[in-house]
Amino acid sequence: MHIHDWPTHERPREKLLARGATALSDAELLAILVGSGLRGQDAVQTARDLLHRHGPLRLLLDRPAKALTRLPGLGPASACKFAAAMELAQRHLMSALERGEALSDPPSVGRYFSQRLRARAYEVFAVLFLDNRHRAIAFEELFTGTIDGADIHPREVVRRALLHNAAAVIVGHNHPSGNPEPSEADRAVTKRLLDSLELVDIRLLDHFVIGDGRPVSFAERGWLE
């Protein structure tokens, strides 16, 4: 059955317009980007198959556009829609940060770190530098590889913060395994970083660990007090 033959209230586009995007499942949202399904399938079933065979969602959406075109059911047009949607989401979050709006909403900052780091196949440690009104100055990826206490150099974070004349920083790194739970090494290096930044009167506002699902916030857990 084609989606056009579905009851109106069950069609993804009509459902989105009537109830908002949050009312749709992952497959229904993807179906809107897919447009039309494979022969003999509707777009929702094609989207479900994509998630089943090439998911989870983060791995599917974070693929480069050229890689998406090689998946069944996704031609160049759909692949470009996927890539454009992800880039728009990232730019929206950065725009909010630049206007100083998102820092009153810590989950938005966590989502921004997720957008930047989640798809990496290796660990990346990044820093968001902020002015004295907590507006974004710059976002930099400072360390890559296997992140542990020996790989993060607090002096380099301090040096870059002073170069940007930053009053505060938010840091984040990803766990390619998908498990966002901080390790003991993560906690140890965060303590070293906190102590180093305090020496030059720069605040460490949060440390996000990125994996599948919601980022883990050190500030939310009370680990920066």
Curated annotation (Swiss-Prot):
Signal peptide: none annotated. Zn(2+) binds at residues 173, 175, 186. InterPro entries: MPN, RadC_JAB, RuvA_2-like, UPF0758, UPF0758_CS, UPF0758_N. GO terms for biological process: proteolysis. Keywords: Hydrolase, Metal-binding, Metalloprotease, Protease, Zinc. A motif (JAMM motif) lies at residues 173-186. The keyword Metal-binding applies. PROSITE patterns: MPN (PS50249), UPF0758 (PS01302). One of its GO terms (molecular function) is metal ion binding. CDD domains: MPN_DUF2466. Pfam families: RadC (PF04002), UPF0758_N (PF20582). Residues 102-224 form the MPN domain. Belongs to the UPF0758 family. NCBIfam families: PRK00024.1, radc. This is UPF0758 protein XAC3915.
